[in-house]
Regions:
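Flexible glycine/proline-rich
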Residues: 42-193
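N-terminal hydrophobic or amphipathic helices and topogenic motifs
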Residues: 138, 143, 149-238, 257, ...
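Periplasmic-binding protein-like
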Residues: 265-277, 367-396
Length: 416
């Protein structure tokens, strides 16, 4: 670990190039005048390149100093990983006389178990002229193997830990439409016969079901797409089960009309998991003095909203109409979050004054909560998937004592 000092960096890099066959400079690239690494490289040797057209990993640079390769690794962990896989590992293979075709060396670097094709579950936009490394999750529904990109930030290691495979998109990829076939470098062995795919309404308690499901020898992968998005995906045959809490304004009931519409005559089974409390989430101490929905409409409040089609968004829009408040008069109405925790976190960090969400999200961040309503949260499962091992394990896990205890600790839930 060295201080950010030009002369000290020069001393150590020069010494390293004399004593070792290859030198790596960690976290040595930055934007602005404090990026000393390029000055060190230029003063001691020949710069080979500064920056690569790869995402993540763009800030990487390399030089030859005293006849030795010196590589600067980017500061963000995912960028560093890609640089190690695509540049450092092949270079080590070359220096040790074990060079091979570049793609094969990279596949070996990331620990590829096998290569296999898959179809994109959702459209993906790739930056022009940039080779993009995607961390993807996968599931098979029917005879189709689907893949979708996880969070792509260079600082996010969660996506790498959660992913099943790496997919490399060429610089020419640009807009990859849904169902585009991509090649996967599998980094995890997945038993697709026992993995179910969930798409639907977000709830932290549902995510906790993964553990008991896996204890029962199965698995499920999930995508948070909102209640409406989940039912739509189910109708297109793009998941094994969904979840919904959609308010029908005409009757005051939940889910019936929407499930009937999307099922279109097919038999879809409904499982009531729990009732949960929805309300207004505000900062601790309630500095804006919000006590009901009318206050939310009348006071100078910055709101954090949910995506169209989410059950919480349907509820919020209904309450706006009920109070005669136009959506365009709500500050932050267009600021979209896709999960309860994301929306609550905007309140926690001061980016918003309030959001509509579940009590457990407020409690998790120590925020204040004004309850408004209680709603049913239902799983929706087509009849043809009821014997799927992932679904069988899921339904059994709903009675898991440990999971139920955790849900009760979270707060804001009531069992049927």
């Amino acid at each position: 670990m060295l201080p950010d000092n030009l002369e000290i960096l020069k001393e150590y890099v020069e010494r390293g190039a004399k004593e070792y066959d290859i030198v790596l400079v960690g976290a040595g690239s930055a934007k602005g005048r404090r990026d000393h690494t390029i000055e060190v490289f230029e003063s001691l040797g020949e710069v080979l390149f500064r920056g690569v057209r790869v995402k993540p990993g763009r800030p990487a640079m390399a030089a030859v100093i005293n006849g030795k390769p010196v590589i600067c690794l980017p500061g963000f962990p995912m960028s560093t990983a890609v640089t190690l896989w695509s540049l450092v590992y092949p270079l080590l293979r070359l220096l040790t006389g074990r060079a091979a075709e570049q793609t094969e060396m990279i596949k070996d670097a990331i620990g590829t178990l096998e290569s296999r094709p898959a179809k994109l579950l959702v459209q993906h936009s790739s930056p022009a002229g940039i080779e993009e490394w995607l961390r993807v999750k996968t599931a098979r529904v029917g005879d189709k193997l689907y893949a979708w990109a996880l969070t792509s930030g260079a600082s996010v290691l969660w996506a790498l830990a959660e992913s099943d495979a790496i997919a490399m998109l060429p610089p020419s990829a640009l807009e990859c439409e849904k169902e585009t076939e991509i090649n996967l470098w599998m980094t995890r062995k997945v038993d697709y016969d026992r993995r179910a795919l969930f798409q639907g309404s977000d709830d932290p308690a549902i995510q906790l079901l993964v553990t008991p499901v896996r204890r029962r020898g199965a698995d499920f992968a999930s995508r948070t797409v909102g209640s409406m998005g989940g039912l739509a995906a189910l109708s297109r045959g793009e998941c094994h089960f969904a979840a919904a809490h959609l308010l029908d304004e005409s009757t005051g009931g939940y889910n019936d009309v929407f499930i009937e519409r999307f099922a279109n005559g097919r038999k879809w089974n409904r499982v009531l998991v729990f009732y949960r409390t929805q309300g207004i989430i505000v900062a601790r101490g309630n500095p804006k003095g919000i006590h009901n929905f009318a206050d939310l409409c009348e006071k100078d409040v910055v709101f954090s909203n949910r995506q169209p089609g989410a059950g919480t968004r349907v509820l919020f829009d209904h309450l706006l109409r009920e109070h005669g408040k136009p959506a365009d008069e709500i500050k932050g109405y267009s600021q979209i979050c896709t999960t309860h925790m994301e929306a609550a976190n905007r309140v926690y960090t001061g980016l918003a004054d309030a959001t509509l969400g579940i009590k457990s999200a407020a409690d998790a961040l120590g925020l204040d909560f004004i309850p408004l309503t209680e709603e049913p949260y239902e799983l929706v499962i087509p009849e043809e998937y009821m014997n799927h091992p992932g679904i069988v394990a899921l339904l059994d896990s709903l009675h898991d004592a440990e999971w139920r205890a955790k849900v009760e600790e979270m707060g804001g839930y009531r069992w049927p």
